[in-house]
């Protein structure tokens, strides 16, 4: 749901392609796509819920017609809500036992507890209710001080540590997007931060392992994400995009917006 357009993609996994070949297990294959000129969104933020709802409905309908499928739930890209990144380190005692799924669940739960405590209004550090957690990504495990562990399950140790990359966004902005999508009779399965999605869709494994910065300039926002060690370690979005360049060209040359957009695109 962007400033310049609203897009809907319908994907299928693990099914035969039109040429008779089978897609790789878990590999999504686009079977429908729809897009509409965005109305009611400015600099990535919804300013008119009715207009945004109409654009979402039309984009989804177009994708459904192409895919010949009817969808009831969606995953929504999020670029609004002033996303914030923070790295939080957490330790748990293992007692020399073998690490399993329950230990990972325990350390992730402790991460969320520490975040809520740090943002408790009684501590004078703001209110956690003002921001909604979008992503909680482990960016590095260590066991008894040994770093660089990708997956600690099955290993033994006394202390398990993890650095968690937490990405949050304004609760009000998220609720507004939910309201617009709900009015289209669609259930939201989850949110994906736009710069995170941009990195996942464009980077190869070597790039994300060695370290890379992804910059995605949209119509009303520009997003940035940094990947290292195969994971996103930082993300941010600013409310400035290609439309601002178009407006500057139009003002500088005293030409209509449509002409300025063409000049920007060509040159």
Ranges and model annotations:
Residues 164, 210-252:
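Glycine-rich phosphate-binding loop of actin/hexokinase-like ATP-binding domains
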Residues 1-213, 231-233, 256-267:
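Nucleotide/phosphate-binding catalytic cleft detector across ATP-hydrolyzing
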